[in-house]
């Protein structure tokens, strides 16, 4: 509100303040009467003007003041509208009737400072009170949380106690349930024992009455008495279901018939025995209806209860042993089956690898093939650039060619690691592959060529060489001479190029000889092993002697080193040629050397690529014999030349 009152001062109030100031009124009166204003001894004179102008000046000032008042009124109205829109209240004009003196101003300023200080103190007190309230609230919240935690802990303890009590009750119930059947079983067993004892005693009495007749001899009396004593001490325990009544009746009837036929005097005794047997039968039916009975279908003199018990024990032991043996037998069979499955899987994998012997080893990687084809494309572009005399494109294409060759030779090192391996060499031997010692795709200088004088001496000394070799050498010399004439080489350039050519050829020949010797030694080792009757399989290599293994590994490593050194030699020659010749001359050399090499003995790469794609494109995996045939065809130089000529004619 204070800020709004300060800027919403009406023009009437401003004009009243000006009128109250006597100094301003005096200046205005002077200006109206004399046309001059005195302000701190600064005189303003208007003597050169006419009297008419003096009269017109106050009217202009009044008009300006009126215009100023109108503008201020418009601004005032706009401010009132803004105020009403902001605060939604009508504007009240401030009252300036009271004149403020300097003393009042000096008194008001410290009052304002005190008010500000009081306000700050009030604000500080309010902030402190708020902080205290917040602290109290935090303390109350912490106390409530602690109380809640204590209540939760008490509830958890109560729950645990209840669970423990429930578990104890359950255990007691289980124990009672387990004890009840055991008690019942014990009672039943005791009752059974009592009944069996009673039955045994009664049966013994009946047997004695039955067998101890007047006609029985003394020995039988003694045997039966001894048996009865043994029977009393060692009571039988059998699980065989028997019927004592029927057996006893049958025995008694047989004995009675015999006694009636032999002696008529024994009738009374037999009748007594029958009566006793009938009484026993009735009592036994009542007491032993639920008990298993003893089988006495044969002579009691032959019974031996010890043998019966031993037989049962033997049966239980034999059954246990049989079950254990059965489990062991099943485990052995399962282990054998697992071993057989593992062996079958291994054999399947080995068969698959044998079917793909040549593909994985001799198949060149797609990256290397793509790089070689790109080099050929670059050479074709160089031919066009030479025809068009475009030096910029020549420089760019030569740069691309050098970069691609460096990448290509780095990939060939990886392929060398694949081939120079005893297992891979063994597989190639099984497949019947004969590798060519020279696998160079592009030879810049065309083989064995020294200076012209050395070539003439060699031709004179070696008269036994074939005519084809002479023709090849003449062709090599002729294309190189033609290149010198076409490129317009200087004497220095031709001399440097000849020296570099001689050095390259000598190094290349030495490396070729060493590689051929190492190849022959490796083949001798494998051929000697094959002729000795030793199976050439990957497993058989593990059974070699350590000396042979070391020899083979050393020779293979040397062969690898020689191949890599030949690759480095080619790279060095490329870099040295670029330093001797200009870009146009270098491009022309690459084009001529490429044409000469493609017409000559170097293998054609499209043929290789087509062969490998034909092998891989088959739906079924190719057999071992198909791969061997293809590799032999590739190794035969005659067939390769025929295919090259055929493609070249196309």
Curated annotation (Swiss-Prot):
InterPro entries: bZIP_sf
Parts of the chain that traverse the membrane: none
ATP-binding is among the record's keywords: no
UniProt feature, compositional bias: Low complexity: 252-278, 452-466
Ranges where the record places region Basic motif: 307-327
Region of interest (Disordered), residue spans: 109-130, 242-279, 452-473
One Gene Ontology cellular component annotation held by this UniProt entry: nucleus
CDD domains: bZIP
Segments forming domain bZIP: 305-368
PANTHER family, A to Z: CREB/ATF BZIP TRANSCRIPTION FACTOR, GLYCOSYLTRANSFERASE-RELATED
Name of the protein in question: Probable basic-leucine zipper transcription factor K
Gene that produces this protein: bzpK
């Amino acid at each position: 509100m204070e800020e709004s009152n300060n800027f919403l001062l009406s023009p009437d109030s401003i004009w009243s303040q000006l009128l109250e100031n006597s100094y301003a009124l005096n200046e205005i009166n002077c200006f109206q009467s004399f046309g001059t204003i005195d302000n701190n001894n600064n005189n303003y004179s208007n003597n050169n003007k006419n009297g008419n102008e003096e009269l017109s000046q106050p009217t202009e000032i009044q008009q300006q003041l009126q215009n100023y008042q109108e503008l201020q009124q418009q601004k005032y109205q706009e401010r009132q509208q803004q105020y009403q829109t902001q605060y939604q209240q009508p504007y009240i004009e401030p009252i300036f009737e009271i004149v403020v003196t300097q003393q009042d101003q000096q008194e008001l300023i410290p009052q304002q400072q005190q008010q500000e200080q009081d306000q700050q103190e009030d604000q500080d007190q309010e902030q402190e009170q708020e902080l205290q309230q917040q602290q109290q609230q935090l303390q109350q919240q912490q106390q409530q949380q602690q109380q809640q935690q204590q209540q939760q802990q008490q509830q958890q303890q109560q729950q645990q106690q209840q669970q423990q009590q429930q578990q104890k009750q359950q255990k007691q119930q289980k124990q009672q349930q387990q004890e009840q059947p055991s008690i019942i079983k014990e009672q039943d067993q005791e009752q059974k024992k009592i009944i069996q004892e009673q039955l045994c005693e009664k049966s013994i009495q009946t047997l004695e009455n039955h067998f101890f007749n007047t006609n029985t001899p003394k020995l039988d009396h003694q045997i039966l008495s001894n048996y009865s004593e043994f029977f009393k001490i060692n009571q039988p325990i059998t699980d065989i279901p028997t019927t004592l009544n029927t057996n006893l009746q049958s025995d008694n009837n047989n004995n009675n018939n015999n006694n009636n036929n032999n002696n008529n005097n024994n009738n009374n005794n037999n009748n007594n025995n029958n009566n006793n047997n009938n009484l026993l039968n009735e009592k036994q039916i009542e007491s032993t209806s639920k008990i298993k009975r003893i089988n006495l279908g044969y002579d009691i003199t032959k019974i031996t209860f010890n043998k019966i018990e031993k037989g049962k024990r033997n049966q239980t032991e034999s059954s246990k042993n049989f079950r254990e043996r059965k489990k062991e037998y099943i485990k052995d069979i399962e282990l054998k089956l697992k071993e057989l499955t593992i062996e079958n899987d291994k054999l399947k994998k080995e068969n698959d690898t044998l079917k793909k012997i040549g593909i994985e080893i001799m198949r060149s990687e797609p990256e290397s093939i793509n790089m070689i084809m790109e080099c050929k494309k670059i050479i074709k572009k160089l031919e066009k650039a030479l025809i068009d005399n475009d030096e910029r494109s020549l420089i760019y294409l030569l740069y691309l060619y050098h970069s691609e060759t460096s990448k290509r030779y780095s990939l060939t090192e990886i392929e060398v690691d694949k081939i120079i391996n005893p297992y891979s060499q063994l597989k190639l031997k099984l497949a019947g592959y004969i590798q060519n010692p020279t696998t160079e795709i592009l030879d810049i200088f065309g083989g064995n060529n020294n200076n012209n004088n050395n070539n003439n001496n060699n031709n004179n000394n070696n008269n036994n060489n074939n005519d084809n070799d002479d023709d090849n050498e003449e062709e090599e010399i002729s294309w190189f001479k033609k290149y010198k004439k076409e490129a317009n080489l200087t004497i220095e350039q031709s001399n440097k190029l000849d020296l570099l050519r001689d050095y390259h050829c000598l190094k290349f020949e030495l490396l070729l000889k060493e590689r051929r010797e190492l190849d022959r030694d490796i083949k001798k080792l494998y051929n000697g092993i094959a002729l000795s009757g030793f199976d050439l399989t990957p497993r058989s290599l593990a059974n070699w002697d350590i000396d042979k293994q070391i020899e083979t590994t050393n020779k293979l490593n040397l062969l690898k080193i020689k191949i890599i050194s030949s690759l480095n030699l080619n790279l060095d020659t490329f870099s040295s040629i670029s330093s001797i010749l200009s870009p146009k001359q270098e491009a022309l050399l690459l084009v001529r050397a490429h044409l000469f090499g493609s017409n000559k003995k170097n293998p054609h790469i499209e043929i290789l690529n087509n062969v490998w794609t034909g092998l891989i494109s088959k739906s079924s995996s190719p057999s071992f014999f198909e791969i061997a045939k293809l590799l032999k065809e590739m190794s035969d130089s005659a067939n390769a030349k025929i295919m090259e000529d055929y493609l070249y004619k196309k």
